[in-house]
Regions:
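Glycine-rich phosphate/diphosphate-binding loop of Rossmann-like nucleotide-binding domains
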Residues: 2-40
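Short, ordered loop/turn segments at secondary-structure junctions
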Residues: 11, 36-38, 65-66, 87-90, ...
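Glycine-rich phosphate-binding loop
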Residues: 48-90
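Glycine/charged-rich beta-loop-alpha catalytic/anionic-binding loops adjacent to active sites
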Residues: 2-3, 28-32, 79-80, 103-113
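Short, solvent-exposed amphipathic alpha-helical segments in soluble enzyme
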Residues: 20-26, 49-50, 77-79, 128-130
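C-terminal binding/interaction regions
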Residues: 8-15, 19, 94-152
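N-terminal beta-loop-helix "entrance" segment that forms/cooperates
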Residues: 33-53
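Short glycine/serine/threonine-rich phosphate/pyrophosphate-binding segments
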Residues: 13-17, 42-45, 64-73, 92-95, ...
Length: 152
């Protein structure tokens, strides 16, 4: 049963999202990946967000570029934690997505990571920190990773 739902706004985001997937696997976190667009498939975004908790998902990760509405759209339909990964998809090189992800109204938060691959990996590490509060094997995997970072 997936603990994390990874949602990308377009199939063209797959290369960056693969960094998230690889990191979730490293952290021993079960996940699922979906392509859903806040603009092209808003009803499917709503349905996914509303059903996520009953399906066992505990954290949502949303990767989107441009107006990056996906994270906010998901957060508007659920009280699960939503982590946003802004992606560079226009001449603005991700600044538009970064600001859109970060500037959520009070009460509908989206945790905003860095633009691109660093943000993609940190989204998974942040999910590990959240899930590690409840699951010892995830906490231990993340702590081991951090130990290895110190020893480099």
């Amino acid at each position: 049963m997936p603990q994390v739902g990874v949602i990308m706004g377009s199939a063209s985001d797959e290369q960056v999202v693969q960094e998230t997937v690889n990191t979730l696997e490293q952290m021993k976190i079960d996940y699922e990946v979906r392509v859903l667009s806040a603009h092209r498939t808003p009803d499917r975004v709503r349905e996914y967000a509303q059903q996520a908790r009953e399906r066992g998902i505990q954290v949502l990760i949303a990767a989107a570029g441009g107006s990056a509405a996906l994270g906010g759209a998901l957060a508007s339909w659920t009280t699960l934690p939503v982590i946003g990964i802004p992606l560079a998809s226009s001449e603005l090189k991700g600044m538009d997505a970064l600001l859109a992800t970060a500037q959520m109204p009070p009460g509908i938060p989206v945790a905003c990571m860095a633009v691109g691959s660093w943000g993609a990996r940190n989204a998974a590490y942040f999910a590990a920190e959240i899930l590690g509060l409840k699951y010892d094997h995830i906490r231990q995997a993340y702590e081991e990773y951090r130990r290895q970072l110190r020893e480099r």
